[in-house]
């Protein structure tokens, strides 16, 4: 809901790069919804509601036969990471959410084996992307690489520093490219 509004087409382009440029197997369900993260962080929905929404996303992943999950939005990544960590610490809460999900829409899920943010995958495949790039981020006059500023959202690196490339103090996603 945030990323799509601030950066229209970014999710579609991410899928285009992954599926058609890199030849990777990525799937986006037409039944996928917002994660509820903004509503949760604004205190308009309770934590259990946000968790049930995320559990439904994981159920869609499970139903499609996938075991890894890529979040495109920084808030979603932070929300999913926080939820998985909470379920790890409080398995009884995960059981409650599983029950709520079953009662609400008759769905079950497996937790993802690996949760990644889309920028982590762009970083992982940066060399392959560079080899296939039609355009390069260089000064057209000098051929020198452009100097850019990187801002990594706090939901990406500060809440769970071990989950993002470079951590909270030295984010390395764009710099490393």
Q: What residues fall within each predicted segment?
A:
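Iron-sulfur cluster-binding electron-transfer modules in prokaryotic oxidoreductases
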Residues: 1-177
């Amino acid at each position: 809901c945030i990323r799509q509004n601030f950066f229209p087409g970014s999710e579609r382009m991410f899928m285009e790069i992954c599926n058609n440029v890199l030849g990777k197997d990525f799937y986006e369900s037409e039944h996928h919804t917002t994660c509820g993260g903004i509503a949760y962080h604004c205190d308009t929905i309770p934590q259990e509601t946000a968790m049930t929404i995320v559990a439904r996303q994981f159920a869609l992943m499970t139903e499609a036969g996938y075991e890894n999950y890529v979040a495109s939005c920084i808030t979603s990544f932070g929300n999913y990471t926080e939820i998985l960590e909470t379920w790890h610490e409080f398995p009884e809460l995960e059981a409650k959410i599983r029950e709520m999900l079953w009662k609400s829409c008759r769905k079950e899920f497996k937790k993802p084996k690996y949760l990644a943010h889309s920028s982590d995958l762009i970083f992982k495949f940066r060399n392959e992307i560079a080899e296939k790039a039609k355009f390069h981020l260089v000064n057209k006059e000098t051929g020198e690489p452009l100097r850019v500023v990187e801002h990594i959202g706090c939901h990406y690196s500060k809440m769970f520093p071990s989950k993002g490339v470079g951590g909270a103090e030295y984010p390395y996603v764009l710099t490393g490219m």
